[in-house]
Design a protein with these regions (language model features):
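Signature of extracytoplasmic/envelope-associated structural regions
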Residues: 1-269
Length: 269
């Protein structure tokens, strides 16, 4: 799927965990899809040597995928997106799941049992702050109704976070001069639990009765990033060097108290 001009996207997960649908602000580059696993088998036999092509056998769906970008706002309306990326489900070592409702000009879609697998905090000079999201879901459904009850309230105004302040330090050494691009990326490495069974496979006749993934395991998490800096005459002597176990501090926003703030420890660069 590809987003159009009349885009509406809701998540049923709010900061208070009460499952009220909340409308998200996203850029037009929203995309989502789901494919099926095609297993093939040979048709060629002793008596039918001409059957060179293998036949298809579809029984299960792969996990669905989605991708969108949300702006960083001065208001706290969209903090839920960051929380779904970062926070563990209460009392567990796994992630919260949620539902996405997507309205396009001519149809509506729903992604069930969504989980965010990748989030990139985008910091670019002359651009507003943004958060890029990628994720997976168990099932993509077409032609469903948008949630109309109990919608989460949004602030009356939306103020995008400008980058009036950008500071970076690595191992207590400031790198502010010449910085033009910074990104911080959190990867949630998940694996969908096996869901192909003989009994269920016998009941598969079409897409509606296919087997879909339902549960996943969080295998590991990786936090990485990059810093773009123009080459200057007094460039730091750490160029083309590496260090481990050092702190990295990044602040980007309208001031050093607003926007994206990272105080990372035990980093390697």
């Amino acid at each position: 799927g590809q987003a159009g001009s009349d885009l509406r996207i809701y998540t049923n997960q709010t900061t208070s965990n009460n499952n009220y649908p909340l409308r998200l602000d996203v850029t037009p580059e929203l995309s989502f899809s789901q494919t099926f696993t095609d297993s093939t088998y040979a048709q060629k036999t002793i008596h039918e040597q001409h059957k060179m092509h293998e036949a298809s056998n579809i029984k299960k769906a792969n996990s669905a995928s989605f991708e969108f970008t949300v702006p960083a706002l001065t208001q706290n309306d969209l903090a839920v997106v960051k929380d779904l990326l970062v926070d563990y489900k209460t009392g567990t070592n796994t992630l919260n799941t949620f539902t996405l409702h997507i309205k396009l000009p001519n149809d509506t879609y729903r992604l069930d049992n969504c989980v965010i697998t990748n989030g990139t905090f985008i910091i670019e000079k002359l651009e507003n702050l943004k958060l890029g999201i990628q994720g997976q879901a168990s099932r993509l459904v077409k032609g469903v109704s948008l949630p109309t009850f109990g919608r989460g309230t949004r602030s009356a105004s939306r103020t995008h976070q400008r980058i009036d302040h950008l500071s970076v330090s690595i191992d207590s050494t400031p790198l502010t001069d010449g910085i033009y691009n910074v990104s911080i990326e959190l990867q949630n490495d998940i694996e969908w639990n096996p869901y192909l069974t003989v009994n269920d496979a016998l009941n598969v006749t079409n897409a509606a009765t296919s087997m879909y993934p339902s549960n996943f395991t969080l295998k590991k998490r990786v936090l990485s990033g990059s810093i773009g800096q123009y080459v200057q005459s007094d460039f730091d002597t750490d160029t083309q060097q590496w260090k481990t176990g050092v702190p990295v501090v990044i602040k980007a926003g309208e001031s050093d108290q607003q926007g994206f703030q990272f105080n990372l420890t035990n980093c390697t660069f």
